[in-house]
Amino acid sequence: MIKVIICGALGRMGTMIANMVIENPELEFVGGVDIRDGTVLGKPVVPSEKLAAFIDEVKPDVMIDFTVAAATMINAKIAAKKGVALVIGTTGFTPEQDAELLDAIKNVPVVKTTNFSVGVNIFWELVRDAASRLGDYDIEVIEAHHRYKKDAPSGTAKTILKVIQEEVGKREEMYGREGMTERKNEIGVHVIRGGDVVGDHTVQFHQNYETIELTHRAYDRAVFARGAIRAAAWVPKAKPGVYTMKEVLGL
C-alpha cells in the first residue's frame, strides 16, 4: 500500500482527505503535520518542526499538502530531500516562491495544480478549445469564493488566464473597471468574495450579437479532496518531475 501523510491534517480539508485516504484500498494514512500536536483517525499529527524526524519514523511514500504558501515552501522542501513524492494543492505563491519551490522539488515526482477537481480540469480544456477558436472575441473571467479566501484572484482563475493567453497571445489583465474606460487588448478579471461559496468560475466570450459562456461550480470541497486522492495513488509510480492533473487524468 501507498503510505500517505497530510500537511494541515487537523484542518477541515486535511481531515476530509484523511477520511478519503482510509477508504481507498491503494492508500494507507500514517499520520499528519500541522501547527500543533494531535491525532486524526487514531494516527499521530506532529508540529511542522518535527516533520523530518516524522518522515524518518513513518516512511511515507506521498505527502499531500493543502496549507498556505509559507508552510508549503518549508514542508515540501523537507519531504523532497527525503525522497517523498508530493501532491501540492496550495495556492497563493508569489512568482519567486513558485520558481524556488519548483527547483527544490524537481528530483521527486510531484503533482502540483491550482485545482484538483476533475470537472475544473475538463473546464480548462474547454476554455482552451474555445479560446483557440474565438481569439477575436472580448473575453471576461469571473470568479467567486467564500469570504475567507485569502488569495485573489484564485489560483484556478490564474490558470484560466494562462490557458487563454497561451491560445490568444498576451493580453493585459484588467482587474475591474472604473471611470471612463476604452476596450483595449485585454481580458477583464472580476473577483467576488462572499458567504460560503466553494468556488465558481466563469469565462465569457463576447462578440456582436452573441455571447458564449462557460461556467464551473463546485458545491463541496470534496471534489478537490477526491482529485488529490487520485493524484496520491498515481504520483509514486511516476518518474521525478512536476506534473498536473492533466497527466493524472490522461487528458
Swiss-Prot record:
Its main location: cytoplasm. NADP(+) binds at residue 36. GO terms for molecular function: 4-hydroxy-tetrahydrodipicolinate reductase; NAD binding; NADP binding; oxidoreductase activity, acting on CH or CH2 groups, NAD or NADP as acceptor. InterPro entries: DapB_C (IPR022663), DapB_N (IPR000846), DapB_N_CS (IPR022664), DHDPR_bac (IPR023940), NAD(P)-bd_dom_sf (IPR036291). Pathway: Amino-acid biosynthesis; L-lysine biosynthesis via DAP pathway; (S)-tetrahydrodipicolinate from L-aspartate: step 4/4. NAD(+) binds at residues 8-13, 89-91, 113-116. The keyword Ribosomal protein does not apply. GO terms for biological process: diaminopimelate biosynthetic process; lysine biosynthetic process via diaminopimelate. Its EC number is 1.17.1.8. Pfam families: DapB_C, DapB_N. Keywords: Amino-acid biosynthesis, Cytoplasm, Diaminopimelate biosynthesis, Lysine biosynthesis, NAD, NADP, Oxidoreductase. (S)-2,3,4,5-tetrahydrodipicolinate binds at residues 146, 155-156. HAMAP family: DapB (MF_00102). NCBIfam families: dapB (TIGR00036). Catalyzes the conversion of 4-hydroxy-tetrahydrodipicolinate (HTPA) to tetrahydrodipicolinate. This is 4-hydroxy-tetrahydrodipicolinate reductase. It comes from Methanocorpusculum labreanum (strain ATCC 43576 / DSM 4855 / Z).
